[in-house]
Design a protein with these regions (language model features):
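N-terminal regulatory/effector-sensing and dimerization cores
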Residues: 1-98
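Amphipathic alpha-helical segments enriched in hydrophobic/aromatic residues interleaved with Lys/Arg
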Residues: 75-130, 137, 152-154
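Solvent-exposed, amphipathic alpha-helical segments
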Residues: 103-110, 148-159, 203, 207-211
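Short, contiguous, well-ordered secondary-structure segments
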Residues: 107, 166-168, 218-219
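Short, Lys/Arg-enriched, Trp-marked, Pro/Gly-tolerant hinge/linker segments that flank
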Residues: 112-176, 186-198
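Key DNA-contact positions within bacterial/archaeal DNA-binding proteins
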Residues: 178, 182, 227-228
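Terminal helix-turn-helix DNA-binding modules in bacterial transcription factors
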Residues: 186-226, 231
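Short, contiguous hydrophobic alpha-helices characteristic of membrane insertion segments
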Residues: 233-236
Length: 237
């Protein structure tokens, strides 16, 4: 059940233990399990103290975490799922990456633990959160925009109309071909070429529905040899 949603297996940090995060992470902590906990989160010479008084989503940047009191019981969350979804939303609205605020850890009150057990439920919760007018949610969106997954999906979407190889995409992104494939597999949650082909089909179908041009013209625009080739691709999905 855990493996189907955002919630990953429980971890524990004891008093005095330290943990170094190399990438932004998101944790779920239950207030009743972490009543006497104090965390100190450090980046360089900057320190931030955090105490847990309720169920929270803990958003942590690249940093070192030290437990100075109590025992931390937490579940890491699959940040890639929400980062990918936000990347699609931002791409569709033409949003540009905003400046990040100065804090490198934030605790957001979270009373919807049940949604974390299902990918569908968590995505529905996230979309509802995005559409709400509560400004505090912008902290979550800013955090997700810091992730490699978000940046990679935005990059792939920006390049999706260009007929180019994964090798060339990786080179332009600034990493080796093998590392680029690994990054893409994690960010997309599946086979890279299959996912990119799916995006191409979806964009082409959307243009046809919107009536922007005829099928043959759109098929050629998206790299299909003919309208028959495009139709066959759509039917295969």
């Amino acid at each position: 059940m855990i493996e189907e949603g955002l919630l990953l297996p429980m971890n524990v940090l004891l008093q005095g233990q330290k943990l170094t995060l190399l990438d932004p992470e998101m944790w779920f902590l239950r207030g009743n399990e972490n009543k006497d906990v104090t965390l100190v989160i450090t980046i360089g010479n900057n320190h931030q103290k955090l105490m847990v008084v309720e169920d929270i989503l803990l958003l942590i940047d690249r940093s070192q975490i030290e437990v100075t009191a109590g025992k931390v019981i937490y579940h890491p969350l699959r940040i890639d799922i929400l980062s990918k979804l936000l990347a699609f939303i931002d791409e569709s609205t033409g949003s540009v990456e905003r400046e990040h605020h100065e804090l490198f850890a934030d605790a957001l009150p979270f009373a919807s633990e049940v949604v974390l057990f299902s990918k569908v439920a968590s995505e529905a919760w996230f979309l509802a959160t995005y559409l709400s007018s509560d400004n505090i949610n912008e902290i979550l969106f800013q955090h997700l925009r810091k992730t490699e997954c978000y940046k990679l999906v935005r990059y792939l979407l920006s390049q999706s109309l260009i007929q180019t190889s994964l090798y060339d995409l990786g080179e332009l992104y600034g990493v080796s071909y093998s590392h680029f494939r690994r990054l893409c597999s994690y960010a997309l949650g599946g086979k890279v070429k299959t996912e990119l082909c799916g995006w191409r089909v979806a964009r082409a179908v959307l243009e046809i529905i919107e009536g922007n041009s005829d099928m043959t013209t759109i098929a050629h625009k998206y790299g299909y040899s003919s309208s028959s080739h495009f139709s066959a691709e759509v039917k295969s999905r």
